[in-house]
Amino acid sequence: MSRMMIVVEFEVKPEHRNQFIELMKGHAQRSRAEDGCQQFDVLLPQEDHSRVLLVEAWRDQAALDVHSKAPTMAKLRETYQPWLLNRKATRCIAD
């Protein structure tokens, strides 16, 4: 089984940046406790304060699928969606 890595880049509306960061920090902490989560970091680029990155590592695709399909994920997306200008996710296999 291959380890799965995801980098998610969010462009956040300035007036919601602090709310978004706090929401993602809580999400990261909860995600780290999930079975199969090997890494879940919230990164704040120094050169662009409108962006927030998530870097995730999962044991395998099955662990990522459980995380992605959890009911809490739908609620999380519903909460932050109005705060975003853009979102880009890149999935990678880490061998």
Stretches with model-predicted labels:
Residues N18, A62-D65, A74:
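Alpha-helical elements of the RecA-like P-loop NTPase motor core of helicases
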Residues M4-E11, D41-S68:
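Short, well-ordered beta-strand segments in beta-rich or mixed alpha/beta enzyme
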Residues S2, D41-S50, L76-D95:
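Glycine-rich beta-strand-turn "strand-cap" elements at beta-sheet edges
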Residues H16-Q38, L76, Y80:
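Short amphipathic alpha-helical segments
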Residues S31-D35, Q61, A70:
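Acidic-histidine catalytic/liganding microenvironments
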Residues K13-P14, W83:
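Short linear/disordered segments characteristic of secreted peptide precursors
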Residues H27, H67, T72:
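Histidine-centered active-site/metal-ligand motif
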Residues H16, S50, T72:
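Short phosphate-engaging motifs
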